[in-house]
Amino acid sequence: MNWITKILKAGQNIKERIKDRASREELKSSKWMPSCCGSAPVLKETIFNEEQLNTCPNDNCQFHYPFPPRSRFDHFYGKNNWEEIDTPRIPDDPLSWPNDVYKKKLAAARKLTNQRCSVLVALGERDGVKVTSFAINSAFIGGAISIESAEAILKACDVAIQNQTPLIAWSEGGGQIMFESGLSLQGMTRTVLGVNEV
């Protein structure tokens, strides 16, 4: 067997292994998932429950899986003990990317997360104290901060100042979104100034 035949055979083996893998839909609907700490597959219900709070039960691992903002607010404030604050809407795609690349990414992220941007703002009560909070959703384009996300953070700061409440932030993912270039970097400065006001 010459070297070309070996390479072709190896490529064929790789293709067959890829075909044998489960699809994304099958993985989502399955009760099982790959373990984060390299052991055998684990039941999803052992990780995604009220006791574990999306954290690996293995004491040597304690890996934290993403925790969507609405679930986080339900856990922190108590179910139905908080209200979602409307945040300013900014026009999509301020730099007019060709072929609507950015608009398509935004549409897919909105459909996946049921959020307008990566930041969700809430006002609720915890142990008799009113608290304003915001959470970043890593499922929304990796939790990247767009102009609209920065405006949402500023809205959280304004609500905290107006209601004289503490402000709690849960960051998951982040960084400025590349599709908005320098415009999103301006948002970083504004959010720092807003948080300093609180």
Task: Specify the residue positions occupied by each region the protein language model found.
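Terminal-region recognition feature
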Residues: M1-V198
